[in-house]
């Protein structure tokens, strides 16, 4: 039976917990990031605990001694729960909660909670609920026990700010319904994409680590008016806007959801239809926060996620953002990209270079056209203006002299006996 439980807002005080099996500095950096995630989700981190172990304990995540230590810290700090920096198995969740007698959450629950509060579009809400149900279906017993302790907080947000408790059969049925709805959305996206291709409008996807400044960049370039907050996952639903380049060429720019380390696989699966905007784009703009001391790690995470999505064959521009806040001696280099620019989306520095680079790349993907059109063929010049880059238009006695760059698929219909060649 489906049971709806109304939630009340609470202030959660949580202890962040991680297991380091190698580089402790990396574990500290990951916990710092988890602290930002927890803050974004509306809770406060009152302590951070790292246990150095050869491997994560398969039954309880932590060792017995560390569990006792954390139990004391929970009492001392009046904490309402703990958040583990890795995704817990159903057994780990259940056993750890039993040992600590408190609410236990993991990194995935926090990320899903943020996504649930940020989803605006129908597609975004479907994708978040699908990811939540896939995660919860294997953890029903542990989650019911844990979430019922406080009646709300991290891990309980969802459609309508209510917690939906289901048995496995109902969850399975609901997942099937959501997948069908997502297929409908995907088909609609495909129709829109085909129309875009028919109109010969190139597209660029803006990707990057969360909080790298993707939305700020899109706002700067297109005056899109997107909420650009200094928060993790400020953008969840993709936004597409048109950018007119100096030579008249149009390009569609799409802001996508940010990537993050330890991004749950079922989240990537759920958001595949959204991330396909990157897969079917002509250019990838990889925005990098070059003021972040963990810049190299963040770049690695983005490339690994793109590889998992099968997006490795696109023209890549690495956009080193926030140069106004970066250390003077920082080395900015990305051997995996085709082009690199340094900008500040906040101040506007370097944006002209980025725009010119986009124009150059698109021009090099076109065919050069030079010919004289009769005055009866003026409609073809309108096509060039709309889909290409008109370099020169000169009215002569015998017709209109034109040279331009045009999409290769339009060249045959525009050229006739024209003098043309690939640049």
Swiss-Prot record:
This is GTPase HflX. Pfam families: GTP-bdg_M (PF16360), GTP-bdg_N (PF13167), MMR_HSR1 (PF01926). One of its GO terms (molecular function) is GTP binding. GTP binds at residues 208-215, 233-237, 255-258, 321-324, 344-346. Belongs to the TRAFAC class OBG-HflX-like GTPase superfamily. HflX GTPase family. Signal peptide: none annotated. PROSITE patterns: G_HFLX. SUPFAM superfamilies: P-loop containing nucleoside triphosphate hydrolases. It comes from Lacrimispora saccharolytica (strain ATCC 35040 / DSM 2544 / NRCC 2533 / WM1) (Clostridium saccharolyticum). GTPase that associates with the 50S ribosomal subunit and may have a role during protein synthesis or ribosome biogenesis. HAMAP family: GTPase_HflX.
């Amino acid at each position: 039976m489906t049971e709806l439980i109304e939630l009340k807002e609470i202030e959660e005080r949580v202890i962040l917990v991680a297991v380091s099996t190698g580089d402790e500095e990396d574990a500290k950096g990951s916990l710092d990031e988890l602290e930002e995630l927890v803050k974004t989700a509306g809770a406060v981190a009152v302590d951070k605990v790292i246990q150095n172990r050869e491997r994560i304990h398969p039954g309880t995540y932590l060792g017995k001694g560390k569990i006792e230590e954390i139990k004391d810290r929970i009492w001392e700090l009046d904490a309402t729960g703990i958040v583990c920096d890795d995704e817990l198995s159903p057994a780990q969740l259940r056993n750890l909660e039993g040992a600590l007698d408190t609410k236990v959450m993991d990194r995935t629950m926090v990320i899903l909670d943020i996504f649930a509060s940020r989803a605006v579009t129908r597609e975004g809400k479907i994708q978040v609920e699908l990811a939540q149900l896939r995660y919860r279906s294997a953890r029903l017993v542990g989650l019911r026990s844990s979430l019922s302790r406080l009646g709300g907080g991290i891990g309980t947000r969802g459609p309508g700010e209510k917690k939906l408790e289901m048995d496995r059969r109902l969850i399975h049925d609901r997942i099937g319904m959501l997948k069908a709805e997502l297929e409908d959305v995907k088909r609609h996206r495909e129709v829109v994409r085909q129309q875009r291709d028919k109109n010969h409008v190139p597209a660029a996807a803006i990707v990057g680590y969360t909080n790298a400044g993707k939305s700020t960049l899109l706002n700067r370039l297109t005056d899109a008016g997107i909420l650009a907050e200094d928060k993790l996952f400020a953008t969840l639903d993709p936004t597409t806007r048109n950018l007119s380049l100096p030579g008249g060429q149009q390009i569609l720019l799409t802001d996508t959801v940010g990537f993050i380390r330890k991004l749950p696989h079922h989240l990537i699966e759920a958001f595949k239809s959204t991330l396909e905007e990157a897969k079917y784009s002509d250019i990838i703009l990889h925005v990098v926060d070059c003021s972040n001391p963990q810049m190299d790690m963040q770049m690695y995470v983005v490339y690994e996620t793109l590889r998992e999505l099968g997006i490795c064959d696109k023209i890549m521009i690495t956009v080193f953002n926030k140069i106004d806040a970066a250390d003077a001696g920082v080395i900015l280099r990305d051997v995996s990209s085709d082009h690199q620019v340094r900008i500040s989306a906040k101040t506007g520095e370097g944006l002209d270079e980025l725009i010119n680079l986009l124009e150059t790349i698109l021009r090099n993907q076109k065919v050069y056209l030079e010919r004289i059109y009769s005055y009866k063929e003026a409609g073809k010049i309108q096509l060039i203006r709309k889909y290409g880059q008109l370099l020169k238009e000169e009215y002569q006695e015998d017709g209109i002299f034109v040279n331009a760059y045009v999409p290769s698929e339009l060249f045959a219909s525009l050229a006739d006996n024209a003098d043309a060649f690939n640049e």
